[in-house]
Amino acid sequence: MAAQVISNSGHDEMIHDAGLDYYGRRLATCSSDKTIKIFEIEGETHRLIETLKGHEGAVWCVAWAHPKFGTILASSSYDGKVLIWREQHQNATSPVAGGAWTKVFDFSLHTASVNMVSWAPHESGCLLACASSDGHVSVLEFRDNSWTHQIFHAHGMGVNSISWAPAAAPGSLISSNPGPGQQRRFVTGGSDNLLKIWDYNPETKTYNNTQTLEGHSDWVRDVAWSPSVLSKSYIASASQDKTVRIWTSDASNPGQWTSQQLEFDTVLWRVSWSPSGNILAVSGGDNKVSLWKENLKGQWEKVKDIEE
């Protein structure tokens, strides 16, 4: 596995997040220095093309929207704001040429740090979910050239992380009798040690807490819903309690979740699935990344340690 290191990031303080766009040609980074930097990646080389300024505190998270909505980046910060940035292409026939970045939306209804932002699967629409230390989740939607929002209480002691389920329900691709089409659901992780699953009700136009998953004994730092849409749903959660839990639900009994616990020697910060949804990457306080995979018996095994 080749690693490319960007040593001259240009940030003045700690970098908190980095994300590649859909095509792997742009990298966005964000930092305690209150800025976001956009790099163009070509092979082994990279070039800083833009520095975005607008936040008044450390920027925790950056997330690229699907390119069908344009070149759009969301960011969230300690300042309680979610900002949406868009690149305006000068030359419509050659988007690679790049254009000017502008802030197109400033969402500032949260009363504390916004810790994470996550775009929904593009099939569901241009939807951004935001997790805040004020205990609330907001969902922003861009439709008919304007932004609307919903905001609701989720976890009493603050929301640390949020992750959308795939748009297709598990088993729907291989079922002879598929259920309804696009689902809008996500999972949140909180400082109350809980995971909560939220489902959108199109009749009431609200997100409702349909399931609460208990098992961690300390803050849930990160949650990640696997993109796999085969016969099972998987959610991974990383906690301050030095464990990762992998929660599994079978398509034949979608309301029933079981969990398997993976134990570590350090607090855990992030969990991330491979694009196919069968390999889980875990990172924690020891600056190591480990990769995990389910064996034929349904047990999760470590397949690799990645150390710099």
UniProtKB/Swiss-Prot annotation:
What SUPFAM superfamilies has UniProt attached to this entry? WD40 repeat-like
Q: Which residues form a coiled coil?
A: none
Q: Where in the cell is it found?
A: Cytoplasmic vesicle, COPII-coated vesicle membrane; Endoplasmic reticulum membrane; Nucleus, Nuclear pore complex
GO biological process per UniProt? COPII-coated vesicle budding; ERAD pathway; mRNA transport; nuclear pore localization; positive regulation of DNA-templated transcription; positive regulation of ER to Golgi vesicle-mediated transport; positive regulation of protein exit from endoplasmic reticulum; positive regulation of TORC1 signaling
In what way does this protein cross or attach to the membrane?
A: Peripheral membrane protein
Q: Which GO terms describe its molecular function?
A: structural molecule activity
Q: Where are the WD repeats?
A: 10-49, 54-95, 109-150, 154-208, 215-257, 263-302
Q: Does the keyword Cell cycle apply?
A: no
Q: Which UniProt keywords apply?
A: Cytoplasmic vesicle, Endoplasmic reticulum, ER-Golgi transport, Membrane, mRNA transport, Nuclear pore complex, Nucleus, Protein transport, Repeat, Translocation, Transport, WD repeat
Q: Which family does it belong to?
A: Belongs to the WD repeat SEC13 family.
Quaternary structure annotation from Swiss-Prot or TrEMBL: The COPII coat is composed of at least 5 proteins: the sec23/24 complex, the sec13/31 complex, and the protein sar1. Component of the nuclear pore complex (NPC). NPC constitutes the exclusive means of nucleocytoplasmic transport. NPCs allow the passive diffusion of ions and small molecules and the active, nuclear transport receptor-mediated bidirectional transport of macromolecules such as proteins, RNAs, ribonucleoparticles (RNPs), and ribosomal subunits across the nuclear envelope. Due to its 8-fold rotational symmetry, all subunits are present with 8 copies or multiples thereof.
PANTHER family in alphabetical order: NUCLEAR PORE COMPLEX PROTEIN SEC13 / SEH1 FAMILY MEMBER, PROTEIN SEC13 HOMOLOG
Q: What does this protein do?
A: Component of the coat protein complex II (COPII) which promotes the formation of transport vesicles from the endoplasmic reticulum (ER). The coat has two main functions, the physical deformation of the endoplasmic reticulum membrane into vesicles and the selection of cargo molecules. It also functions as a component of the nuclear pore complex (NPC). NPC components, collectively referred to as nucleoporins (NUPs), can play the role of both NPC structural components and of docking or interaction partners for transiently associated nuclear transport factors.
User: Can you say what this protein is called?
Assistant: Protein transport protein sec13
* Origin species: Aspergillus niger (strain ATCC MYA-4892 / CBS 513.88 / FGSC A1513)
